[in-house]
């Protein structure tokens, strides 16, 4: 197994609001689709690399204490974290150096109440 992550889903209660949040916070466009009758907003990715989506499924609920994923924070993690409040979320951990050249992370609560991380090598 070269990479254990293949796909992730971030639950939403309001897909339009969550899509607007992530598009603003990450400065990117998400692609809207439906899979099995469930609406989704898919993050940009290319096969065979891992991908993921925001999903609106009644059996899934946003959480701030469940599984934690880290999205790509690009070259300027501080810029991503600075956009979080205006997009409707809150930063719960500022840019933090992991040491030993591993990179940097930050944590936020999204517009739906999910705790999500961002990672950058810089």
Predicted features, each with a name:
Residues 2, 9-50:
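Core segments of cupin and vicinal oxygen chelate
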Residues 18-22, 84, 113:
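Conserved active-site tyrosine of GNAT-family acetyltransferases
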Residues 3-13, 31-34, 42, 59-85, 104-109, ...:
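Vicinal oxygen chelate
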Residues 18, 50, 80, 88-91, ...:
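Amphipathic alpha-helical interface surfaces
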Residues 50-51, 112:
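Short alpha-helix boundary/capping motifs
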Residues 45-46, 57, 72, 121:
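Generic beta-structure capping elements
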């Amino acid at each position: 197994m070269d990479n254990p992550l293949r796909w992730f889903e971030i639950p939403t209660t309001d897909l339009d609001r969550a899509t607007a949040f992530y598009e603003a916070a990450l400065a990117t466009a998400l692609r809207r689709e439906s899979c099995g009758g469930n609406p989704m907003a898919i993050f940009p990715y290319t096969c065979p690399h891992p991908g993921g989506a925001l999903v609106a499924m009644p059996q899934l609920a946003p959480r701030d204490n469940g599984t934690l994923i880290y999205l790509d924070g690009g070259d300027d993690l501080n810029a991503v974290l600075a956009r979080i409040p205006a997009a409707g979320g809150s930063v719960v951990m500022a840019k933090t150096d992991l040491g030993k050249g591993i990179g940097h992370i930050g944590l936020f609560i999204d517009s739906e109440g999910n705790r999500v991380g961002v990672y950058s090598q810089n």
